[in-house]
């Protein structure tokens, strides 16, 4: 679990005291080896129990476990930075050669994958896969780049026998949402979790008794609050981006994992359908 990533992405979810702790940890991560919870509490003007509760909120058993994990993450990131600092900065500039751009893009996508996979709650993921597998009907919603991810997932799911709707038109998305029933599933893909169209569809789906699964960022958002289940994605986009490249990479890693998990649940039948699909498309050549 990448605690530094969770701290930096979950700021809006923190209380005032929790934000003080988060800011302190981020600003002093290189010096945490010599910091105790008592020292932190005194410096921040809060109780030691607040620090312990903060650590537990992030998934650690206590402050000591969180502190050691942060030290380890910081050391690992320093090692990676030292090996790539000359060429792989955090943003692409107008002066970069295509070779440097390629290396930066690859590194950014690698980080998106590493950080997203590190945040997976695999027990929750298994539960989500089971819920999807039992759904009579699945709707997938998304806008822009997220819509492309959704369309790819819809094709994969249809290939193994699921009834899926993934419409590009937002009015049609809303119309489908209000017609969902209990047992149906809506998979809402939105990194920000705040797009009006996606939130509206999630509200409609939930009102009808459907299960809402959100593929979104760690930040608090209307979609995150509406969803029955969330699958977290991490991405660092920069100013020289005409498209959300690393975001799509992170989202695709989640949707591909869902697909493979569903294939595993019913492997014999799924593989037969994949084979039949391949045979049919071969006849079109």
Swiss-Prot record:
Residues 1-77 form the HTH rpiR-type domain. The keyword RNA-binding does not apply. InterPro entries: Homeodomain-like_sf, HTH_RpiR, RpiR-like, RpiR-like_SIS, SIS_dom, SIS_dom_sf, Tscrpt_reg_HTH_MurR, WH-like_DNA-bd_sf. Represses the expression of the murPQ operon involved in the uptake and degradation of N-acetylmuramic acid (MurNAc). Binds to two adjacent inverted repeats within the operator region. MurNAc 6-phosphate, the substrate of MurQ, is the specific inducer that weakens binding of MurR to the operator. Residues 128-279 form the SIS domain. Pathway: Amino-sugar metabolism; N-acetylmuramate degradation [regulation]. This is HTH-type transcriptional regulator MurR. The keyword Cytoplasm does not apply. One of its GO terms (biological process) is carbohydrate derivative metabolic process. Residues 37-56 bind DNA. The lineage of its organism: Bacteria, Pseudomonadati, Pseudomonadota, Gammaproteobacteria, Enterobacterales. Keywords: Carbohydrate metabolism, DNA-binding, Repressor, Transcription, Transcription regulation. CDD domains: SIS_RpiR (cd05013). Homotetramer. It comes from the Bacteria. GO terms for molecular function: carbohydrate derivative binding; DNA binding; DNA-binding transcription factor activity. Pfam families: HTH_6, SIS.
């Amino acid at each position: 679990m990448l605690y530094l990533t969770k701290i930096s992405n979950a700021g809006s979810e923190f209380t005032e005291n929790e934000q003080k702790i988060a800011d302190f940890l981020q600003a002093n991560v290189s010096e945490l080896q010599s910091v105790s919870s008592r020292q932190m509490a005194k410096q921040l003007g809060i109780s030691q129990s607040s620090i312990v509760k903060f650590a537990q909120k992030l998934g650690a058993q206590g402050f000591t476990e969180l502190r050691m994990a942060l030290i380890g993450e910081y050391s690992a990131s320093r090692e990676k930075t030292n090996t790539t600092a000359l060429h792989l900065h955090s943003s692409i500039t107008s002066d970069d050669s295509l070779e440097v751009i390629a290396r930066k893009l690859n590194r950014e996508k690698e980080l998106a994958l590493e950080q997203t996979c590190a945040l997976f709650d695999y027990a929750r993921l298994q539960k989500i896969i089971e819920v999807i597998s039992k759904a009579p009907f699945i709707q997938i919603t998304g806008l822009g780049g997220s819509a492309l991810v959704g369309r790819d997932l819809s094709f994969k799911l249809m290939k193994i026998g699921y009834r899926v709707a993934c419409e590009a038109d937002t009015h049609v998305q809303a119309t489908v949402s209000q017609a969902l029933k209990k047992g149906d599933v809506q998979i809402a893909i939105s990194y920000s979790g705040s797009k009006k169209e996606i939130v509206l569809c999630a509200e409609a789906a939930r009102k009808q008794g459907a299960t809402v699964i959100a593929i979104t960022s760690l930040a608090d958002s209307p979609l995150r609050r509406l969803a029955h289940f969330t699958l977290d994605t991490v991405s660092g986009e920069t100013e020289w981006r005409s498209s959300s490249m690393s975001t799509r990479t992170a989202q695709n890693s989640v949707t591909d994992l869902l697909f493979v998990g569903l294939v595993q649940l019913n492997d014999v039948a799924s593989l037969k359908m994949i084979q039949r699909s391949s045979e049919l498309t071969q006849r079109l050549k």
